[in-house]
């Protein structure tokens, strides 16, 4: 700040007029005003938004304390790695320059259950009242709190009795987590689920898939997951391999305004796309079977509806065929080509089988001698044999239960752990009873 203070003294001298001593009532020194505010260094935000967030205004008195407060205010948002200022005189006023460097870490803001407002309304309100809001908030700083505070203010204006909270939402270790904002304390029971754009599918059957959503409190994040795990597979099973569902749109189900407790109607926008038929796959790479045999394993026939669920199961069966022959690192990469004119889909499948693994040692822990002996007798994958990657699951599901019954053993928990040695290409298997 020493440099800034010296600059201020020099600046002050420019506005001070020297002259002969005057007796009588002293006149006050005229105020120095900010004539313009410039911003440099920014990429994400506009100059106007940064100036608004700083709290500075053109025409206000020039004061160092105000400049210090402005850069501190910018820093507190968390949106900047640093913020500083320069200034110089121009035409009897002061030009202020805010020099910033924006942070790289921002996270998307998601509004989970504000059913009283459209997403557009929320976005417009926050962009107007929180100067740096652009749908995202920095990882550090107070901007997320400012967003929550503005949402709380909006609820109060509408007479809605709910408390706004925000949490970090995402899978453990996921760097792309989101800020999730909730209106806690609001009862928002879903009474209807609609599909906008569902024109060719059997809507009655689709509605049955949506029944689990009824009588639940609305939450965008939960409904997104449900759509991805239920509605998308529903369409793919019927050949709609390029179906797309947008985010659900909630709104009060009744015409009159609701406050805290609302019956909610939810609409999913759907772009169904075409119903595709299967065209024989093109197989490339490390093939351990003939193309004809691979097609049989897939279980698909030319001209039949390209059932996405059946196709996924077919590729899983092909993978298991490689596992059965010891290729447990196999990589199967299907690439789709859609012919919208013929309404067909062709998969070009590249296979890299990787190394072949062999069986190492079988370890049995926590068992009686009788059970240990029985399992060793039943286990057919011997040391040195090609390791069957499917066998451990099959053995646990079938032979293990048989051995428990024959030895009259009760097991509350069974753990299986294959130990894969990438260097020796050996797999040791441990089975433990707890």
Feature locations, PLM:
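Signal peptide processing junction and immediate N-terminal pro/mature segment
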Residues: 15-27
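Interaction-mediating elements
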Residues: 24-434
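Positively charged n-region of N-terminal signal peptides that target proteins for export
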Residues: 1-4
